[in-house]
Amino acid sequence: VRNLVEFILRSGDLDNSSGGFGERDAMQAGTRVHQQIQKKRGADYRAEVPLVHEKEYEHFILRVEGRADGMYEDGTTTVIEEIKGTYRDLETMEEPVPVHLAQAKCYAYIYGLQNRKEEMGVLMTYTLLSSEEEGLLRPLTKEEVKPENSNWRIRHFLQTYKLPELEQWFDELLDAWFIWAEFQYQWQKARDASMQHLEFPFPYRKGQRELVSGVYRTILRKKELFVQAPTGIGKTMSTVFPAIRAIGEGCGDRLFYLTAKTITRTVAEEAVSILKEKGLQFKAITLTAKEKMCILDEPECDPIHCPRAKGHFDRINA
């Protein structure tokens, strides 16, 4: 669910400076506050509720699954709770983050559909995180975690949706995803077809045919292969070519070629380019260190210092 809504709905700026804390620190703090809130919700509260929904298309089946942070009954209405930890000022927060709300709405729709509900409640709960460097904040009280209460430590947003409203919203979300998924399907179909009759682009050198066969068989058998060979035998093409052919046979979807030096990276790029000239349809990217790629003197991935960070997610989702 999270991957789906982030892929379709994520917008705004790229900002790695938010809060100034490390990702690992935030995850640990987030786990603590999740558990605090869940334990204080009462005996009827269900935590970490697994939900699964499948929709069949012509060429594939979409399986949407995830875990709702919590669920409880409020009178005749079932409420799905999504808990998010944050370092931002909660007192100035006027509404939930759209991507966070979308995640909870997906859970609400799936549960409502499967349990024939007429309406569903969605409770977004934001709570202030503390870093290990700051020291832990005192535990939240039972009174503070009540949905009707909000303060500088915790903020709640409760909304109720009719199931037809959720259904229309969810269908539009999947329709947006389908455009990309169908494109991916057709691309992979064309890619795999181009690999079926791909031939080794050069006459084989001594030992090269054995290396190509060894790499290919190793991938098919899901084993590991360690090779020591002299310079000039053509190791790069002899490993890239059979790996790509194996992808065409359904043995994988991506190929990672790791290098320690720029020159070996360049040789790998040239190998893929040569195969493309022979008819291969294949997308290849080179991952380069941020420090080498950045247009700034010092990498600062935030909308204030970097024009490329400003509106980054608006552009990639356009």
Residue positions per predicted region:
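Metal-dependent nuclease catalytic cores that hydrolyze phosphodiester bonds in DNA/RNA
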Residues: 1-77, 102
